Amino acid sequence: MNKHQKPVLTGQRFKTRKRDEKEKFEPTVFRDTLVQGLNEAGDDLEAVAKFLDSTGSRLDYRRYADTLFDILVAGSMLAPGGTRIDDGDKTKMTNHCVFSANEDHETIRNYAQVFNKLIRRYKYLEKAFEDEMKKLLLFLKAFSETEQTKLAMLSGILLGNGTLPATILTSLFTDSLVKEGIAASFAVKLFKAWMAEKDANSVTSSLRKANLDKRLLELFPVNRQSVDHFAKYFTDAGLKELSDFLRVQQSLGTRKELQKELQERLSQECPIKEVVLYVKEEMKRNDLPETAVIGLLWTCIMNAVEWNKKEELVAEQALKHLKQYAPLLAVFSSQGQSELILLQKVQEYCYDNIHFMKAFQKIVVLFYKADVLSEEAILKWYKEAHVAKGKSVFLDQMKKFVEWLQNAEEESESEGEEN
């Protein structure tokens, strides 16, 4: 069967699609066009932003995103490792970039705005920019100290305004950066810039969302991964808020472990003397205050039993159970603040577990008689230290007992005066 040649349409010109037009550009052509435009715009960052906005319609930002961001940050295309590919040819580089900018927060913030505008205009660059920043952090050893500082400031500002996620910081945990002290030094500069944009709560919240709150010690070599070393390093750098945050995080981790072990010992019905000894040792070893422990003890004690579902029976069951563990609670409620925390925990528990609503007053009286709670703590709770949960119900329950305490106090005072 003969194959016939397909007819060719003559006299017709086809317009190249814009997408295909873009793909004709090679990285070097892309680089030259970008460098020329940045040099023409000069130090006028508004002009730079406009140039980048308009040029995106004819340059393929999607394909050459790494080249685009290399040049905007370092002024040149970067080879693997961070060295400049065109270091010897000034015509292929620009001085109008982050690394050539003045080393002050306001100047770098203005550069950050250029990145913000570019990524808002071309949303598809968002992921590419995140990848670029992770890459640049891996290349820190190739950059000078002042370049590292400017990159840290830029990263902190962009983290502050939400352009970058905190996950970029994982690059800092690279062994070589950690061992040479670059990771910790860079992190301090970055956090300072971040906290100049946002408050400490916002910064720590972002760290938690990125699951980095428990990894901050990894900024230091293994032999220096202690809370004390971190706290001193960051406090000396003016970042006490981060030091305090890490201490709290470490304390929370310790408390979880302590709670788990306590729960196990209570379920095995270990003698109270043994539990007291264990808790005291853990408090000393982990520098835990009594105020941090009393709430844990209450939670563990209440979790150690299967409660009756009938409201009329649960109060009796609770009193019997708590009477057994009152000596344990008494040991760790020797301070007024600890007593108030315990009272608030009892209040919250009785509110959250509806069968216990009517048992609150009976529990407090039991603790008073067992020397777990003092008269002063109960009166302070009643007057000002109660929490909002079910307060009207519980204050009403406690009214007669509080009146009795106040009368007893007045009688005691009058007897003292007579004597």
Swiss-Prot record:
List modified residues, type N6-acetyllysine.
117
* Name of the featured protein: eIF5-mimic protein 1
Major subcellular site? cytoplasm
Molecular function, one GO term:
cadherin binding
What binding partners and quaternary form does the record give? Interacts with EIF3E. Interacts with EIF2S2. Interacts with EIF3C.
**Task performed by this protein:** Translation initiation regulator which represses non-AUG initiated translation and repeat-associated non-AUG (RAN) initiated translation by acting as a competitive inhibitor of eukaryotic translation initiation factor 5 (EIF5) function. Increases the accuracy of translation initiation by impeding EIF5-dependent translation from non-AUG codons by competing with it for interaction with EIF2S2 within the 43S pre-initiation complex (PIC) in an EIF3C-binding dependent manner.
The gene designation is BZW2
UniProt GO cellular component terms: cytoplasm; membrane
Q: Which organism is it from?
A: Homo sapiens (Human)
